[in-house]
Amino acid sequence: MRRYPTLVVLLLLVLLPVLGCDLSMKRPIMDEIRKTGVLVVVTRNAPTTYYQGRDRVEGFEHDLATLFAAHLGVKVAFIKKQSRGEVLQTLHEGKAHLAAAGLVRQEEDGDRYLYGPDYQSVFQQVVCRRGGVRPTNLLKLTQAKLTVVKESAYEDRLRELQQLVPQLTWHSDDNLSVEQVLEQVWLGKVDCTLADSNVVALNRRYYPELTVKFPINAEQRLAWTLPKRAVFLHKEVVTWFNEIRSNGQLDELFEKYYGFVEGQSFDFVDNRQFIKRMSERLPSYKHLFMEAARKYHIPWQLLAAQAYQESHWDPKARSSTGVRGIMMLTQVTAKALGIDDRLDPKSSIHGGAWYLSNMRRRLPSTITEPDRTWIALAAYNVGLGHISDARRLAKKQNLNPNRWSDLRQVLPLLSQSKYFKDTKFGYARGDEPVRYVAKVRHYNDILTRMERKNYTGETTPFVEPNTALPMVPLKEQAVIGEINPMDGRMVETSGKEAAVPSPKRRY
């Protein structure tokens, strides 16, 4: 009988390696989260993930993780890293419960990690500077000075392609993020880099000289990454993603962060002109925008963006319809506000700010931010009556009349007789407010981004980068070279600059 305890000890010693993974789950991750009341998330500090906004932290992944923590009934804490390698290392060391960092699902890592549901699709793209080197395929890329983030998915892909093209070389940098490498390309310090299409779609609006040459892989999927042992947390993630897809919360986040990008073609000339005028014209009126912003509780960047859409910051602007000034006020509006001179910048800016504030105030209380602001901008452009018609039409079509993403679908219908004949205010060029809001949001995003970069002391593209580089006319764009992702062969197709796909939702 005395031998049994000894046998039990020996048996445990033999089985310990086998049971190791189960013993490591003695305190599952979900229990740890509930005990501490904190969900620890590792992310990347970037425009597509997590960044310091005007008065709070923002970012698609930040908001998504914050919503998930609220679903669990706990607080959220973020660990900021720069590269994919650092993010995964943090996860591997057990310092975070999950990674919400815009990471691509890597099936070959399935033995190390669990992945949440896919929520976005991207492509890796070769990005260079307009007027610089013009690689049209993988062979020609070997002649460029190529830099990528060290131990990133981009470097993994280059290693694969190097098996096809041995002369392909690159420099891997462990001090810069992908966004910072894109800036180096824009500054002319690096010829080309690789970046995901969603990252390119946002960043080329800040750096318009960035140009996409060709994609180098098939569609990839973004998903949250969790430690292999986080089985119960993974189940919560899957269940919750299904919920936010059904209740529209995921759509709302995409609208917030990509609504001004989705479906919008990139206008290089307009973007470049806007950034140029940020240094040439904006300084003369910035203090007026800030003054009106404080008075009417509207971000000055939004007012400035709207003014640019109205007049390109020209205080003497006028149109054939009779609107005039930097905010293009009508005579009726100016008279109602007691404005004698619509060409006076201060009067015009304050008048426009009051009018936008009034539109926002008059909207139903069921419309919340940020939709309230986007719909108010549409009302500024087309009139509150037509917005009311569009909201009623949205209800008839089982759409949400309080959500801008739904209203922008029905507004263009107001130009069709079968729809406007039954409305109170009749015909409207409904596509105009849709374009108007998209452009204002686009300019607002650039202004906000540039202000943030000024605040943090980063380089800001207010001045022309590397003016020695010649500008290439749009009509002289190179032939696109693509790699067939199935067999690695190069495919050449004639055409314009490679398009940057809009960020694609994965559902």
UniProtKB/Swiss-Prot annotation:
Oxidoreductase keyword on record: no
> What GO CC terms are in its UniProt record?
cell outer membrane
Would you kindly state one Gene Ontology biological process term found in this protein's UniProt entry? cell wall macromolecule catabolic process
EC assignment:
4.2.2.n1
Region annotation LT domain: residue ranges?
Answer: 264-507
Q: What class of enzyme is it?
A: lyase
What are the GO MF terms of this UniProt record?
Answer: peptidoglycan lytic transglycosylase activity
| Active-site residues, Swiss-Prot/TrEMBL | 310
Cysteines engaged in disulfide bonds, as pairs: none
Q: How does it sit in the membrane?
A: Peripheral membrane protein
- Segments for region (Non-LT domain): 21-261
Asked if Magnesium is a keyword of the record, the answer is no
Q: Which Pfam families match?
A: SBP_bac_3, SLT
Domain comment from the record reads as follows: The N-terminal domain does not have lytic activity and probably modulates enzymatic activity. The C-terminal domain is the catalytic active domain.
Q: What does this protein do?
A: Murein-degrading enzyme that degrades murein glycan strands and insoluble, high-molecular weight murein sacculi, with the concomitant formation of a 1,6-anhydromuramoyl product. Lytic transglycosylases (LTs) play an integral role in the metabolism of the peptidoglycan (PG) sacculus. Their lytic action creates space within the PG sacculus to allow for its expansion as well as for the insertion of various structures such as secretion systems and flagella.
User: What is the name of this protein?
Assistant: Membrane-bound lytic murein transglycosylase F
